[in-house]
Curated annotation (Swiss-Prot):
Species: Xanthomonas oryzae pv. oryzae (strain MAFF 311018)
SUPFAM superfamilies: FMN-dependent nitroreductase-like
Protein name: Putative NADH dehydrogenase/NAD(P)H nitroreductase XOO4023
InterPro entries for the chain: Nitroreductase, Nitroreductase-like, Nitroreductase_HadB/RutE, RutE-like
Domain of life, source organism: Bacteria
Length: 196
């Protein structure tokens, strides 16, 4: 492992990064979004399964399809964000394991009813969604993750007839500090962790 990141990098990723509720009217190019995925894909998942699937909603048509699924409190900021990422997971992710994990017959570990692998798809897809937030920050983007939406409506609008299920949404862009809430506290180490 290489040396630790410097304090400025750690601030950008964690300490001074904020969940954004408003964004500048500055587009995010497809090239930047492709670069973002090229970072995300290297984050670890069980058996290198990579079950996450990402839809980068940037068009007016895409936002119009997303709008009916949004909760009232999340609609305006999501429709105004340059990018809304639907972080989803493929419940048939195991079909790609012969390519992604050639060291063993990993596909056979997940054969059987889809329900049996849904938990792994959700868990590892959630990990990849977290990597997306950190990768976005590393590239100078701001993120606003949220779960206030109707998953069934998103799935019907974007994933109908597929084994892909939505998990959460992340608005991306260049944050407008005017939309920030005051910084909320976090639990201390002793409140959230322990040694055994």
């Amino acid at each position: 492992m290489s040396d630790s990141l410097n304090a400025a990098a750690l601030d950008q990723l964690f300490r001074t990064a904020r969940t954004q509720n408003a964004f500048a009217d500055t587009p995010v190019s497809q090239e930047v979004l492709r670069e973002l995925y090229e970072l995300v894909k290297w984050g670890p998942t069980a058996a290198n399964s990579g079950p996450a699937r990402f839809v980068f909603v940037t068009s007016a048509d895409g936002k119009a399809r997303l709008k009916p699924a949004l909760s009232e409190g999340n609609a305006a900021k999501t429709l105004a964000a340059p990018v809304t990422v639907i972080v989803a997971h493929d419940e048939d992710f195991h079909e790609k394991l012969p390519y992604l994990f050639p060291h063993a017959d990993a596909k056979s570990w997940f054969d059987g009813p889809r329900e049996g692998r849904a938990e792994s798809a959700f868990r590892n897809g959630s990990l990849q969604g977290a990597y997306l937030i950190l990768a976005a920050r590393a590239l100078g983007l701001d993120a606003g993750p949220m779960s206030g939406f109707d998953n069934a409506k998103v799935d019907a609008a974007f994933f109908a007839g597929t084994p892909i299920k939505s998990n959460f949404l992340v608005n991306l862009g260049y944050g407008d500090p005017a939309g920030l809430f005051p910084r909320s506290p976090r639990l201390s180490f002793d409140e959230a962790a322990r040694f055994e």
